[in-house]
Amino acid sequence: MWYLIFYCIFQTLVTCFHVPYSALTMFISREQSERDSATAYRMTVEVLGTVLGTAIQGQIVGKAVTPCIENPPFLSENNFSAAIRNVNMTHYSGSLADTRNAYMVAAGVIGGLYILCAVILSVGVREKRESSELQSDEPVSFFRGLKLVMNHGAYIKLITGFLFTSLAFMLLEGNFALFCTYTLGFRNEFQNILLAIMLSATLTIPFWQWFLTRFGKKTAVYVGISSAVPFLIVVVVLDSNLVITYIVAVAAGISVAAAFLLPWSMLPDVIDDFRLQHPESRGHEAIFFSFYVFFTKFTSGVSLGISTLSLDFAGYQTRGCSQPSEVNVTLKLLVSAVPVGLILLGLLLFKLYPIDEEKRRENKKALQDLREESNSSSESDSTELANIV
């Protein structure tokens, strides 16, 4: 209960940081190209930060890893539980203290990085407030703004497609370590395989930024996210092979980069479209971003629930050196069949997303014309007022 309460508080505080941090994209520039570039830089650094955090956590906590439990076929579930208790008693006095200290040190290091990055963000980033031409005299209430946002068709289609593709990659991410350890038999290699995925994602985000600029965002979504499908199928169809696994890891990282970058890059276009349809509504950018963050947290929880229940029903044995065949089949489904189905469903929903490159250019021109018209009107009013004085 203590852990649950403090973990919920931690997630709440992280969300309170993540929502305004993400929404800052709309306030650092009015140019779509500059916002896309800022999003690419942000996602590159986020993925790089994930790699750094994984490396720090792994190096500190990895030294306190407890051994696996041998579970031969004749060992019953009760005997297996007894074996776990015996090993726990044998290693309890030393391993528990070492593990606690390792996690405390890792938490201190990561917490310090959180504070440092938050200070740099607060001090180093300046907002560009929207000029008066797109602002009404009285702001629209939060609840009316929420209703307008949730009735905006382009936003609903985008977050729905984002929901399914995010769930696919979170299932892959959450179960890939177990898949490498038990199904493929690469117990000593899975950390390097995960590192290959994240490094591949980090290095290919600039490529996807160029690709979406050259060919459009919807095309980039289809090419980028769907590119993982054949490799996810190959990794479970072919026999266990370390080289093929690394190739799949690199390919998955390329697709993960697209899944990280593209939905966040498309969101400012939706907000511009919303502004044109509802010029009287202002200051609701945080609503768009907060529901994006909400769906990220939601898919993370759903992914964890699906994985935990599926593995429990299959007979997963905690800390076992090997697993029943049912667990291996379940892991294959969780890292291949289910993600592929979710990706295809998400891409189908992205097909319904109405803002293509032509529509995006039209919105950009309309917003620019609106600003120029308002600026001209403001200058005329100022000149008239000066003449009167």
Residue ranges: model-predicted function:
Residues M1-Y7, T15, V236-A249, S255-S265:
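Helix-loop junctions at membrane interfaces in 12-TM secondary transporters
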Residues A40, R187-L195, S290:
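Small-residue hotspots at the loop-to-helix junctions and early N-terminal turns
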